[in-house]
Amino acid sequence: MKNFVFISPNFPESYWKFCAELKNNGLRVLGIGDCPYDQLKQELRDNLHEYYKVDSLENYNEVFRAVAFFTYKYGKIDWLESNNEYWLMRDAKLRTEFHITSGFMESDMDRIKLKSAMKAYYAKAGIPTARYHLVEGYEDALEFAHKVGYPVVVKPDNGVGASNTYKLKCDDDLRFFIDHMDDNIYIIEEFVNGHVETFDAIIDADGKPIFESGNVTPHSLMDVVNNNEDSIYYIVKDLAPDIREAGIKTVKAFGVKSRFVHLEFFVLNADQEGLGKKNDVIGLEVNMRPSGGFTPDMYNFAYETDVYKIWADMIAFNKCTLNMDRPRHFCAFVGRRDSREYELDHNAVLERYGYCMKLECRLPAALATAMGDQVYMCNFDTEDDLQNYFRNLIRKKGE
């Protein structure tokens, strides 16, 4: 029996489904986390062979000892994953220490975690990226900003999501940022006038996709977080050919095997000198894990499938055992803010869209910053219905 160590299997909450499908496929699933065992969801407990509680997942020595214990008790560890951006570097260090060769090792991490290091691999794939500079201080950042022109975007070179990401519009903005910059290494990039589309896939051990999807984010996540805007995005009914082509090239250039990926691209809204023509695809960043939040469930809603099983099939059999010839839909996400009054209140939304509502729920404050306080997910068969849904749900009272 193969041993699979799942780091932090309780977060996100839906990750128990990965564990369940691994168990169904005959793997011994061993969990490591800092949540007390009796506070784990029953569904997770039912699908873990054993759980090792540490005081803190931030304490590497504790987690190392947990993996060592499982190795002593059950033999060689075949897989170790968290499927979580925050722990990717930790995962790779543990794989390296315990010679677990089924995933990225410590030596691989710069190219998949550092935004500056990703640029060379996008170039290898033949995909352009925004010009950039690693910030040392005000003078060098100012020189770069004047070279490419404002606005510019600054963000941690090793960051997650839109955290500490800012659009700077003038020298004064840049000075303020430099004066208040934390200890992170920051990358400054030319602003790209585009919207984000993704290539999301489960890649097998041969570097081939066994599941493909993508999502479109009409509004910048940076603006959603920094301006407290409504959050909207959707799973595509059919993946655009140019996004698929860019995704496949990126997978090959980065040497991706045996994992879920969420690869982000800009699609230019207009011609941009030095980057390309309107609708050209530009590399943004790679994420070597599933797209966050509710997205895995939204794939399932959109394609009437089960990505938790497809991923576990990849782990166990290096192939998909499901019939993928199923109806396909758009699946649209809207996250609304409690601080705003909307034309359609909560009950009106449920009344109008109950027929196609797949999920609605409240989010805790920790997640609401990026996703909204109240979220709704609906399936649609046409883009017109999808866009009307977005307009209706984010229209403010009196507009």
Regions found by a protein language model. Give the residues of each.
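ATP-binding N-terminal substructure of ATP-dependent carboxylate-amine bond-forming enzymes
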Residues: 1-105, 320, 384-398
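Short, acidic/small-residue loops that bind anionic groups at enzyme active sites
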Residues: 102-114
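Active-site nucleotide/adenylate-binding loops and adjacent lid/helix of ATP-dependent enzymes
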Residues: 111-193, 205-208, 233-245, 391-397
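Phosphate-binding core of ATP-grasp and ATP-grasp-like enzymes
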Residues: 180-185, 190-233, 241-281, 287-296, ...
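C-terminal structural cap/anchor segments
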Residues: 278-282, 288-337
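Peripheral (often C-terminal) accessory segments that flank ATP-dependent C-N-forming ligase machineries
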Residues: 312-399
